[in-house]
């Protein structure tokens, strides 16, 4: 798979994740927020709570599923990016970190994942 195809698959997975989460009642704030030290796939709100969401996609579980694809380093970068985002936007509210894992057609939403 070329890098362009990989990016397209990733974008499609994020689109599926967003549609799924909106069906669950979450509201999109921003997507693909990038800093030199980390990226946030989706930033959403549920009431007054801010939710930072990592989306992981795997075509199949043959080489490990989407859940296994989240490393400690990725979690640390997401935490740092979310903290920076909240400071930059002067947000003083509760937040949580969720993981939305997509393996083929299966979607698994883990709230308070890390």
From Swiss-Prot:
Gene3D superfamilies: 3.40.1350.10
Sample GO molecular function, one term: nucleic acid binding
Cited Pfam families: UPF0102
Family note: Belongs to the UPF0102 family.
NCBIfam families noted in UniProt: PRK12497.1-3 (NF009150), YraN family protein (TIGR00252)
Protein name in UniProt: UPF0102 protein Shew_0226
Species: Shewanella loihica (strain ATCC BAA-1088 / PV-4)
